[in-house]
Regions:
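Extracellular/virion structural assembly segments
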Residues: 1-194, 267-286, 393-399, 403-480
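Beta-strand-rich interaction surfaces with strong enrichment in secreted/lumenal proteins
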Residues: 44-46, 108-109, 245-252, 320-328, ...
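Extracellular Ig-like/FN3 beta-sandwich strand-entry sites
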Residues: 83, 255-257, 331-333, 342-344, ...
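Secretory/extracellular carbohydrate-interaction modules
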Residues: 193-314, 392-399
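Short tryptophan-centered beta-strand motifs in secreted/extracellular beta-sheet-rich domains
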Residues: 262, 327-353
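Broad, structure-driven detector of short, well-ordered beta-strand segments within folded domains
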Residues: 288-300, 336-340, 383, 425-428
Length: 480
């Protein structure tokens, strides 16, 4: 079957397929536009649109029995269904990439114990792409040669070397801007200042507290190179409640308006439970806010996020949240975050992909403390890893990988920095998605600037402020 197969989404099918036939329009369909003018015969030519490109593929595969063939057909149908268009490549023509998604039904022509399968694809992006390549910015300049036949949308990966108020990418015809340049007479300020960065690889500065919400403190917490983990949860105590180890530490300074980031892992196993909690305490040890992730269902793999305000005995606000697609937070390797700015609280939950991108994000809900009940300065943090007695959660299932706390500075009359040393932008001009350290931040884009394509031929791109940024531009050449 060498040279007769295909890949979809840069992966081969779950078993060998042979492409028997394919129908592809070798040139993307062109639809002419005409403008009808009353009183004038006919119409006036008004340019054209490039239509979608359909692809029909006929494949077959081997099976030992009719039932095995039908089972494989079900697997194949599920494998081809994707949320978004993905690269489709035929091994007979490896230099051509189609951004395709399955469309319509899968048709079969059954012969004996097996048969042929017809799969229909649609390419809403009708262009044919070639391989991806990158060009580095050198002292703020990138010379990009686009050998494709049409313009192509670039992806920029930009690393921040020093604090910036703006990021500009431009040519002699177009510009793209994030943030705002600061005139020399304007004040430039940091919106937030990092006051705690604890990798949780050591127990230094951490002590064992005496109280925990809705349960008991027991067992042992250890610091590993991956973060805090529970090696034991303690013997069951009656009446049964949530139990496990907890640790507490002071912040280097008390903080009023703040943001806290806590990356965690909570991996689900059926018939097990698990709970990770982070408390934000005032100087007297009262709980001001608490955020967590938990699996409280012993018969299901199901995680939910939670956010609570106040001590457990007089708590007036409890918020529980599942992902928009409920299983998406299972085997959670992601971020818990708390904001407090003025009297506005906002929790944040997100899975983090291996490439650092935040997905299945929940950040829309917020709470304004009109009664000012939860406004005391934050002086301490407490963490807990717990389970329900009788469930067999193991050490490897739960982990707190670190905690960072920033102080929000009062806005000054001036222009804020939008990024600092070590931050990374990824700007996908094709999708319009902009991420800063994996989080979508389209709000930074200057309203009057535009995403622009790389024209065929030689292109000169400029990156400013070039002494504070480094990066590269990535393109895929394409043709009709």
């Amino acid at each position: 079957m060498e040279g007769l197969g295909l890949t979809f989404g840069e992966r081969r099918p779950p078993f060998d397929l042979r492409v028997i036939e394919k129908q592809i329009g070798r040139i993307a369909p062109i639809r002419r536009k005409s403008l009808v003018i009353p009183g004038r015969p006919g119409a006036v030519p008004n340019g054209y649109d490039t239509d979608v490109r359909p692809i029909k593929v006929v494949v077959d595969f081997e099976a030992e029995s009719k039932q095995e063939w039908l089972d494989k057909l079900e697997v194949l149908a599920a494998w081809f269904i994707r949320e978004d268009p993905e690269p489709l490549v035929f091994e007979q023509e490896p230099g051509r990439i189609y951004m395709a998604e399955m469309d319509g039904e899968i048709e079969t022509k059954e012969i004996g114990i097996y048969g042929q399968v017809t799969i229909n694809f649609i390419c809403n992006d009708p262009y044919v792409y070639k391989g991806q390549f990158a060009t580095n910015f050198i002292e703020g300049v990138a010379i990009v040669l686009n050998n494709g036949k049409v313009e192509t949308p670039p992806i920029y990966e930009i690393e921040v070397l020093d604090s910036i108020t703006h990021l500009d990418i431009f040519t002699d015809k177009s510009y793209l801007r994030f943030g705002e340049p600061a005139p020399i007479e304007n004040v430039v300020y940091q919106r937030q200042t990092l006051i705690l960065n604890d990798s949780m690889k050591s127990m230094n500065n951490w002590t064992t507290p005496t109280e925990i919400d809705n349960g008991y403190i027991g067992g042992t917490m250890v610091a590993t190179q991956a973060g805090f983990e529970a090696t034991s949860f303690g013997a069951a105590i009656q009446p049964l409640k949530w139990q496990g180890p907890a640790k507490q530490r002071s912040l280097p300074e008390t903080v009023q308006n703040f943001r806290a980031d806590i990356p965690i892992e909570l991996l689900n196993v059926t018939k097990e439970t698990g709970m990770i909690e982070i408390y934000f305490l005032d100087a007297l040890g009262n709980t001001i806010a608490k955020i967590g992730m938990e699996d409280v269902w012993p018969t299901l793999k199901k995680n939910q996020g939670k956010f609570q305000l106040g001590n457990v005995d007089n708590r007036k606000l409890e918020y529980h949240r599942q992902a928009d697609y409920a299983p998406a937070w299972n085997d959670f390797k992601g971020m818990l975050r708390v904001h407090r700015d003025g009297n506005l609280f906002r929790p944040y939950f997100a899975q983090i992909q291996p490439d650092g991108k935040h997905v299945w994000v929940s950040q829309q809900w917020s709470y304004r403390d009109e009664a000012l009940q939860y406004m005391a300065p934050i002086a301490q943090v407490k963490v807990a890893i717990r389970k329900w007695p009788g469930t067999s959660t193991s050490q490897a299932n739960m982990r707190i990988k670190g905690i960072k706390v920033w102080r929000y500075n009062d806005p000054a009359e001036g222009i804020p920095y939008i990024a600092n040393q070590g931050d990374k932008f990824v700007i996908d001009t094709g999708t319009g998605i902009v991420t800063l350290n994996g989080e979508e931040r389209e709000d930074m884009k200057d309203f009057f600037s535009d995403f622009f394509d790389i024209e065929p031929g030689m292109n000169t791109l400029l990156l400013h402020p070039f002494d504070k940024l480094s990066g590269k531009v990535i393109i895929r050449e394409r043709s009709r």
